[in-house]
């Protein structure tokens, strides 16, 4: 085994800290590193252009794809520009516009997800935040093109799920995926936000936990200590995962693909 990828044991809370690390590679980094000839598209054709979600067309190993990412940015000015990775409804509508375009032109879709959730501001609610997320869930469940989603950092709440109704769902080894943050879990269930470490363990939010529940399809190994320790290596492993999955999905009948995708999500949580 490559010494950079030697297994180390981390607690669920340590995975949260790694997932939130300020130097963790962003979705934008993976787009720039893994794909060629990326052309970004803007706007939802209704209200505006949400910078928390970037998307466009690109190629990977001579396969034309649509690529979309919820991204937080990598410095203070980027954090503000990207709204700390919390999309507004126009972001989700932009993503859906690009996905419908991908369906029309028979391009597979690759989604990178890193968000603490959809933006909960008054303006977002007035512009239909819940409806935008619900519409994405509905449309993605029947979209006639292969979809691959990767949780690269945080994947929390419906804001993450809105880009994760996919044929293949992967998590980076130290990413997290949950209905809410450990802080929210501890505050709501125990009325004690100081119990975040306990909440992280109880909520089963790690890649290992979710693979055990068949919520995700695979775990993408990270370099020792996290993706931020060696972003280039991480991107190489992630690229291979994406290419292998694309080749597998492209061989499947579209109707079978849609049926499998729909049933995958209908069966989630059905453990008996």
UniProtKB/Swiss-Prot annotation:
Pfam families cross-referenced by the UniProt entry: ACCA
GO molecular function annotations of the record:
acetyl-CoA carboxylase activity; ATP binding; carboxyl- or carbamoyltransferase activity
Named in its record, the pathway it takes part in is: Lipid metabolism; malonyl-CoA biosynthesis; malonyl-CoA from acetyl-CoA: step 1/1
Q: What is its EC number?
A: 2.1.3.15
Q: Which PROSITE patterns match?
A: COA_CT_CTER
Q: Known SUPFAM superfamilies for this protein? A: ClpP/crotonase (SSF52096)
Instruction: Using the record for this protein, list the coiled-coil segments as residue ranges, or answer none.
Output: none
Q: Where in the cell is it found?
A: Cytoplasm
Record GO cellular component, one term: acetyl-CoA carboxylase complex
List, in alphabetical order, the GO biological process terms annotated in this UniProt record.
fatty acid biosynthetic process; malonyl-CoA biosynthetic process
Q: Where is the CoA carboxyltransferase C-terminal domain?
A: 1-248
Q: Which UniProt keywords apply?
A: ATP-binding, Cytoplasm, Fatty acid biosynthesis, Fatty acid metabolism, Lipid biosynthesis, Lipid metabolism, Nucleotide-binding, Transferase
Matching entries from Gene3D superfamilies are given as: 2-enoyl-CoA Hydratase, Chain A, domain 1
Q: Which reaction does it catalyse?
A: N(6)-carboxybiotinyl-L-lysyl-[protein] + acetyl-CoA = N(6)-biotinyl-L-lysyl-[protein] + malonyl-CoA
Keyword Ion transport among UniProt keywords? no
Q: How does it assemble?
A: Acetyl-CoA carboxylase is a heterohexamer composed of biotin carboxyl carrier protein (AccB), biotin carboxylase (AccC) and two subunits each of ACCase subunit alpha (AccA) and ACCase subunit beta (AccD).
Which family does the record assign? Belongs to the AccA family.
Main role? Component of the acetyl coenzyme A carboxylase (ACC) complex. First, biotin carboxylase catalyzes the carboxylation of biotin on its carrier protein (BCCP) and then the CO(2) group is transferred by the carboxyltransferase to acetyl-CoA to form malonyl-CoA.
Q: Which PANTHER family does this UniProt record tie to the protein?
A: ACETYL-COENZYME A CARBOXYLASE CARBOXYL TRANSFERASE SUBUNIT ALPHA, ACETYL-COENZYME A CARBOXYLASE CARBOXYL TRANSFERASE SUBUNIT ALPHA, CHLOROPLASTIC
Name of protein = Acetyl-coenzyme A carboxylase carboxyl transferase subunit alpha
Q: What species does this protein belong to?
A: Clostridium beijerinckii (strain ATCC 51743 / NCIMB 8052) (Clostridium acetobutylicum)
């Amino acid at each position: 085994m490559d010494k950079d990828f030697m297994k180390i044991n981390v607690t669920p809370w340590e995975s949260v800290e790694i997932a939130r690390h300020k130097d963790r590679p962003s979705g934008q980094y993976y787009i720039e590193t893994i794909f060629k000839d990326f052309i970004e598209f803007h706007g939802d054709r209704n209200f505006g252009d949400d910078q928390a979600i970037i998307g466009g067309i690109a190629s990977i190993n001579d396969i034309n794809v649509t690529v979309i990412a919820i991204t937080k940015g990598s410095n203070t000015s980027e954090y503000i520009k990207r709204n700390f990775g919390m999309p507004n409804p126009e972001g989700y509508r932009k993503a859906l516009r690009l996905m419908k375009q991908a369906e029309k032109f028979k391009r597979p879709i690759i989604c990178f997800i890193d968000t603490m959730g959809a933006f909960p501001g008054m303006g977002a609610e007035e512009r239909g935040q819940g409806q935008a997320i619900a519409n994405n869930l509905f449309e993605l469940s029947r979209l006639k093109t292969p979809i691959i989603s990767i949780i690269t950092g945080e994947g929390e709440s419906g804001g993450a799920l809105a880009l994760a109704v996919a044929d293949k769902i992967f998590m980076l080894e130290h990413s997290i995926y949950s209905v809410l943050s450990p802080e929210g879990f501890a505050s709501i269930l125990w009325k004690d936000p100081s119990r975040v470490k306990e909440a992280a363990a109880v909520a089963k939010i790690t890649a290992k936990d979710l693979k055990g529940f068949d919520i995700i399809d695979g775990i993408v190994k990270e370099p020792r200590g996290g993706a931020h320790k060696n972003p280039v290596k991480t991107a190489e492993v992630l690229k291979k995962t994406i290419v292998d999955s694309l080749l597998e999905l492209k061989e499947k009948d579209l109707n079978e693909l849609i049926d499998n995708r729909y049933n995958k999500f209908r069966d989630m949580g059905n453990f008996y």
